[in-house]
Swiss-Prot record:
Entry-linked Gene3D superfamilies: Classic Zinc Finger (3.30.160.60)
Gene Ontology biological process: regulation of transcription by RNA polymerase II
Source taxon at top rank: Eukaryota
Protein name: Zinc finger protein 600
SMART domains: ZnF_C2H2 (SM00355)
Similarity comment: family membership: Belongs to the krueppel C2H2-type zinc-finger protein family.
Cellular component, GO annotation: nucleus
């Protein structure tokens, strides 16, 4: 077993076995202390490094000092005994065995004679900046200290002869071993004033402080990029030199650094040597383990100077800073849309490619994002882990709970920089911004329709496929989107979670509440580009635009009649089915529409809520007041194509058109008599049925025609109903 004599730095002598760490105390070998030799060798090594960097030769005086200082050292110890008394022979006779050999086989300097006749070193010869110490022992076994210095053995400092008993790691010099052992001893004397983190060495603390200050003193001369640590700069420089000499035998991939190759090999072997003591999770890199530990410790050393938010990773801080700077370095090559983070760009690209790599094992549905698949799995499991503390409603996703809590708090943290409008959800803000920019980056190739947000595009795609995977458990009605199903279930449950702060009225849908709030504010944000008319709801604007375009997309399958609005078609269908869902509580008359019933009840109540500001005349319908206004304005918008006669009301024009031949579409089923208007047919059918729906509130007399009732009421002194 090879042994080596080293200094402890405290006047004692350490003897280290190869492969183990054993400590002995010999204090001194005779009157000669090997601590001094090690110190002098260290001084020469340091001076050689300086001279080599400055291009100077190694001064011989330093080398002479190493061998010549032994005379002075002998007199420091009591008794001034010669070395030969303890070692059995003169130390000087064995000094030629001390060599300084240059690294990597370069020509070096060798001490082969005693200091008394040592020749001067040639100027062509240099001492290596990092010399290796070669010590051979010629002392006999009879020496009192032969147990400390093995016979005919050699020690080379480049060998990793110093091993730590705690971790088993080996080093090629004792100073590195001592530094390594400090963490085992728990000696962390350098503390960060910002976050309180402890360090073994002062230089580690200095490097750590740059995380807080953002200092990057090391700059690349090639590209100007700066780094906080010199090791990072060294690694970066290899990108420019592009030297990749380390090759993986498994896959042939090459690396610029051997350390990178070692890390890469762990992918093939699956080796994860770094294990967390808290949760037993294993990692293939120590840096990954260090990052993971912050989850348990809660340490977040990286702080944003703008908003004071803290992060556990530096990369997360760098990404966060882009929120403040507005930087979007990641750009889509297809549609030029820019993104703050690379992950957003990767997600966005799947819109163009249509890639859906994540598949549900339960129903086979595929998703473009893993997070979407994870969320989808909860639908099958019925898991709802997130519960509202106010109303106890449970949600499958935390994001839905956060969104829901804003209903109770009324919080709207997302603000538009253009108009100052605030929103409860970031997605709503993004959709709103497209109103200002006109941007619609999401296009569907099938119908070439464009959308301002990706979720709307995904919803639209289902229209083409006809897929409706979400089914109501109460009525079995199916829906294309889960959100549609959630809204539908509120019809059965009667839940109305959205409440108006002004009048406390509640609504089933958030959009209904938003529309209702405009009643109080009078806001009409939607404007027609044709006539500049404004509307409180987007749907009203869409319907209005059809007046200009003449578009009537809703068609009746029975008679082929077309309508510009879907509710008009729904109401029209009831004419064919005969369905009259709305019934008067006074006279039991039924109506196709609720608005017709509301209009009808005013006959019984004689209510006339709509009053003309010009002449004071009152009306029981808003439409009648609007038509009446045209009398004062002299406006006549409706013209007969046959005789060019104009009318102020559309109904008057329709009635007039029947004067022209062949315009009596309404036929009596009893006597086949035809009429030009539906109202005339209704009056006529009363003759056959004997029905008298119009009743006088004063005397109770009933009439078959409304006009007859109006004339009758004049007898009682009641003003004519218009």
């Amino acid at each position: 077993m090879m042994k080596e004599v080293l200094s402890t730095g405290q006047g004692n002598t350490e003897v280290i076995h190869t492969g183990t760490l054993q400590r002995y105390q010999s204090y001194h070998i005779g009157d000669f202390c090997f601590q001094e030799i090690e110190k002098e060798i260290h001084d020469i090594e340091f001076q050689c490094q300086e001279d080599e960097r400055n291009g100077h030769e190694a001064p011989m005086t330093k080398i002479k000092k190493l061998t010549g200082s032994t005379d002075q050292h002998d007199h420091r110890h009591a008794g001034n005994k010669p070395i030969k008394d303890q070692l059995g022979s003169s130390f000087y006779s064995h000094l030629p065995e001390l060599h300084i050999i240059q690294i990597k086989g370069k020509i070096g300097n060798q001490f082969e004679k005693s200091t008394s006749d040592a020749p001067s070193v040639s100027t062509s010869q240099r001492i290596s900046p990092r010399p290796q110490i070669h010590i051979s022992n010629n002392y006999g076994n009879n020496s009192p200290n032969s147990s400390l210095l093995p016979q005919k053995q050699e020690v080379y400092m480049r060998e990793k002869s110093f091993q730590c008993n705690e971790s088993g790691k080996a080093f090629n010099c004792s100073s590195l071993l001592r530094k390594h052992q400090i963490p085992h001893l728990g000696d962390k004397q350098y503390k960060c004033d910002v976050c309180g983190k402890l360090f073994n060495h002062k230089q580690y603390l200095t490097c750590h402080c740059r995380c807080h200050t953002g200092e990057k003193p090391y700059k690349c001369n090639e590209c100007g990029k700066s780094f906080s640590q010199v090791s990072s700069l060294t690694c970066h420089r290899r990108l420019h030199t592009a030297v990749k000499s380390h090759k993986c035998n498994e896959c042939g991939k090459i690396f610029g650094q051997n350390s990178a190759l070692v890390i890469h090999k762990a992918i093939h072997t699956g080796e994860k040597p770094y294990k967390c003591n808290e949760c037993d999770k294993a990692f293939n890199q120590q840096s990954n383990l260090a990052r993971h530990r912050r989850i348990h410790t809660g340490e977040k050393p990286y702080k944003c100077e703008e908003c004071d938010k803290v992060f556990s990773r530096k990369s997360t801080l760098e990404s966060h800073k882009r929120i403040h700077t507005g930087e979007k370095p990641y750009k889509c090559k297809v549609c030029d849309t820019a993104f703050t983070w690379n992950s957003q760009l990767a997600r966005h690209k799947r819109i163009h490619t249509g890639e859906k790599t994540y598949k549900c094992n339960e129903c086979g549905k595929t998703f473009s994002h893993k997070s979407s698949l994870v969320c989808h799995h909860r639908l099958h499991g019925g898991e709802k882990s997130y519960k509202c503390k106010v109303c106890d409603k449970a949600f499958a996703w935390n994001s839905h709970l956060v969104r829901h809590t804003r209903i109770h708090s009324g919080g709207k943290p997302y603000k538009c920089n253009e108009c100052g409008k605030t929103f409860g959800q970031n997605s709503d803000l993004l959709i709103h911004k497209s109103i200002h920019t006109g941007e619609q980056p999401y296009k569907y190739e099938e119908c070439e329709k464009v959308f301002s947000c990706g979720s709307t595009l995904e919803t639209h795609k289902i229209i083409h496929t006809g897929e409706k995977p979400y089914k109501c458990k109460v009525c079995d009605k199916a829906f294309a989107c889960h959100s549609y199903l959630a809204k539908h279930t509120r019809i059965h449950s009667g839940e109305k979670p959205y409440k108006c702060n002004e009048c406390s009225k509640t609504f089933r849908l958030r959009s209904y509440l938003a529309s209702h709030r405009r009643v109080h504010s009078g806001e009409k944000p939607y404007k027609c580009n044709e006539c500049s008319k404004t509307f409180s709801q987007r749907s009203y604007l869409h319907c209005h635009r059809r007046l200009h375009s003449g578009e009537k997309p809703y068609k009746c399958n029975e008679c082929g009649k077309t309508f510009s609005h879907k509710p008009s078609l729904v109401h029209h269908r009831r004419l064919h089915t005969g369905e009259k869902s709305y019934k008067c509580t006074v006279c039991d008359k039924a109506f196709v529409r609720n608005s017709y019933l509301a209009r009808h009840t005013r006959i019984h109540t004689a209510e006339k809520p709509y009053k003309c500001n010009e002449c004071g005349k009152a009306f029981n319908q808003q439409s009648q007041l609007s038509l009446h206004h045209r009398i004062h304005a002299g406006e006549k918008l409706y013209k007969c194509e046959t005789c060019d006669k104009v009318f102020s009301r559309k109904s008057h024009l329709k009635r007039h058109r029947r004067i022209h031949p062949g315009k009596k579409p309404y036929k009596c089923k009893v006597c086949d008599k035809t009429f030009g208007s539906d109202s005339h047919l209704k009056q006529h059918t009363g003759l056959h049925t004997g029905e008298k729906p119009y009743k006088c509130n004063e005397c109770g007399k009933a009439f078959s025609k409304q006009s007859t009732l109006i004339h009758h009421q004049a007898v009682h002194g009641v003003g004519k109903l218009d």
